[in-house]
Regions:
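Intrinsically disordered, low-complexity linker/assembly segments
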Residues: 1-94
């Protein structure tokens, strides 16, 4: 069993990492919980896309590699401030 949010693909452990839209577009760091129970921070390059991957050597099971696959952090509800900001982004063509 690969664990929650993880699956095996061609012998490599893949873990999905939920990343906020603003971090995908602008870059930044996100906290990642590793299979070992430890956590670390992943640097996300600006203009990243859902489905992009980063490999962490020796971070998987039995010191194997771990691929971190970016997924978009989907909000269940937006605040009025978030809606306002998104509307402004739409108005400038983003």
């Amino acid at each position: 069993d690969a664990g929650e949010g993880r699956h095996w693909e061609n012998g490599i452990l893949i873990q999905q990492v939920s990343i906020p839209y603003s971090t995908m577009m602008l870059g930044g760091k996100v906290k990642v919980n590793l299979p070992s129970g430890k956590s670390g921070f992943l640097s996300v390059a600006g203009n990243s896309q859902p489905g992009d991957r980063r490999r962490m050597s020796k971070a998987g099971y039995l010191q194997g590699d771990l691929d971190l696959e970016f997924i978009l952090d989907e909000q269940e509800e937006l605040t009025s401030e978030q809606i306002e900001v998104l509307e402004r982004l739409r108005d400038v063509g983003l």
